[in-house]
């Protein structure tokens, strides 16, 4: 027994230190929550201060826990049980300290982010500011909202979104929905996203659907937000926490989609992006991205991201040693979702010139004069009309003005009995406006009704 006591005393001392550490942390939290309930100002209590038996209670709880543990028949002697019990208490205390350290990065006010980007031409397109706000955060799930403004060549884009995240084993999964509005052009779209984050790998997928119809951009062109999707994988280096790499695939659908914001439209374009992020301290991240399209067009972007977390001391946000904690799976629950906040636009030619050629009556006779009815809508007037088809045989005649839609007539030709004669003629018109734009009309067919006197004597013979 005398040999056992010296061996067990160090473990009890270690146990008391661990318990004291946890108790000190609990006391600190209690003081922060109830600053006026503590009598630590050195004034006499005049015999009214309640006695504090927290230390005795804590020691009694430790002894009770050890007694219950030692009752289990696990094949260990008393010394080994004491050692395992003490190490378990130390592990729990350290785990509590780590969790509280990580939780200190999660302020109920969320975090504000300012991202400044510069493209090949020195423009700040894509620069944005956002505010991530946790609405409800507990052990099961996180409900959040985000407000943001993104700079585009056409003006500001507002981004408003809500979403949820919850833990599934070693993964953090979630979904979100966003409403993006190009304020100056009054163009809107909806975004639907899903995400799955691991400790060193983050996967994100987004789908974008335009809300608004086509809007006039110029006198000859219309625009709207394009429909499309993107897939992104982001990897954090386990051996060097300051570096992140990312790869993203995106595609948008339409005949003239300006994926690179360069003024050139492509049909259903696809682009692949490779990115590298360097985070020296939690507050600052430097980004570099190369975007390559299948058409050969490419784009390079450099960015500086400032990510300020409310409620977290600035000294902590400027500490390089805090990068691993801030980017850990639990410490990054308040990070912004990975999505394209800068809308991609689709364009089409605006219909400033249209023409329709009405179909004449079906029962046309040889020598009959047929008026042609043209319906032309032109923003820039009419320069000329160019008739196509059997214009000569139909004796096409203009009205008072050759560039007017009014007064055009034709004269149906005689019935033809020769071999290969069809007595069918086709006609259409091309309209050119004063801007040089040309539009073709529909094609009409003019058919003669066979005259009575064209029948042969054999066809007129009666048989009794």
Swiss-Prot record:
Residues 1-24 form the signal peptide. The keyword Aminoacyl-tRNA synthetase does not apply. It comes from the Bacteria. InterPro entries: IAT_beta, IAT_beta_sf, Intimin-Invasin_domain. Its main location: periplasm. Keywords: Periplasm, Signal. It is found in: Periplasm. Pfam families: IAT_beta (PF11924). GO terms for cellular component: cell outer membrane; periplasmic space. NCBIfam families: PRK10177.1. Belongs to the intimin/invasin family. This is Uncharacterized protein YchO. It comes from Escherichia coli (strain K12).
């Amino acid at each position: 027994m005398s040999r056992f006591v010296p061996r067990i005393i160090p473990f009890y001392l270690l146990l008391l230190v661990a318990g004291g550490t946890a108790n000190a942390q609990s006391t600190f939290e209690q003081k922060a929550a109830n600053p006026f309930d503590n009598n630590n100002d050195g004034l006499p209590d005049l015999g009214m201060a309640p006695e504090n038996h927290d230390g005795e209670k804590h020691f009694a709880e430790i002894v009770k826990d050890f007694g219950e543990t030692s009752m289990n028949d696990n094949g260990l002697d008393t010394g080994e049980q004491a050692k395992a019990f003490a190490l378990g208490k130390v592990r729990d205390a350290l785990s509590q300290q780590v969790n509280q350290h990580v939780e200190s990065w999660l302020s109920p006010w969320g975090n504000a982010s300012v991202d400044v980007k510069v493209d090949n031409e020195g423009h700040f397109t894509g620069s944005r500011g956002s505010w991530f706000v946790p609405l409800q955060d507990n052990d099961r799930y996180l409900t959040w909202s985000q407000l943001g403004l993104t700079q585009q060549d056409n003006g500001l884009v507002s981004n408003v979104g809500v979403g949820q995240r919850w833990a599934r084993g070693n993964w953090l999964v979630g979904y979100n929905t966003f409403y993006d509005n190009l304020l100056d052009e009054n163009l809107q779209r909806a975004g639907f996203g899903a995400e799955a984050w691991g400790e060193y790998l983050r996967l994100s997928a987004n789908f974008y659907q335009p809300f608004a119809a086509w809007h006039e951009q110029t006198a000859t062109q219309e625009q709207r937000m394009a429909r499309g999707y993107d897939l992104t994988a982001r990897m954090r280096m386990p051996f060097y926490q300051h570096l992140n790499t990312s790869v993203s695939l995106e595609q948008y659908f339409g005949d003239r989609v300006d994926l690179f914001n360069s003024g050139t439209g492509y049909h259903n374009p696809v682009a692949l992006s490779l990115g590298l992020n360097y985070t020296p301290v939690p507050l600052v991240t430097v980004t570099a991205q190369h975007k390559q399209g299948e058409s050969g067009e490419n784009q390079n972007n450099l960015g500086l991201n400032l990510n300020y977390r409310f409620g977290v001391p600035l000294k902590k946000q400027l500490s390089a040693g805090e990068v691993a904690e801030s980017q850990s799976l639990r410490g990054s629950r308040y990070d912004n979702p990975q999505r394209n906040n800068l809308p991609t636009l689709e364009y089409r030619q605006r219909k400033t010139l249209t023409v329709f050629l009405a179909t004449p009556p079906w029962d046309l006779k040889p020598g009959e004069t047929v008026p042609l009815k043209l319906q032309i809508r032109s923003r820039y007037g009419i320069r000329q009309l160019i008739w196509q088809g059997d214009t000569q045989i139909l004796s096409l005649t203009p009205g008072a003005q050759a560039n007017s839609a009014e007064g055009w007539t034709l004269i149906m030709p005689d019935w033809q009995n020769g071999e290969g004669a069809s007595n069918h003629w086709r006609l259409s018109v091309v309209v050119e406006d004063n801007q040089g734009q040309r539009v073709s009309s529909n094609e009409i067919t003019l058919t003669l009704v066979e005259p009575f006197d064209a029948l042969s004597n054999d066809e007129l013979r009666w048989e009794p």
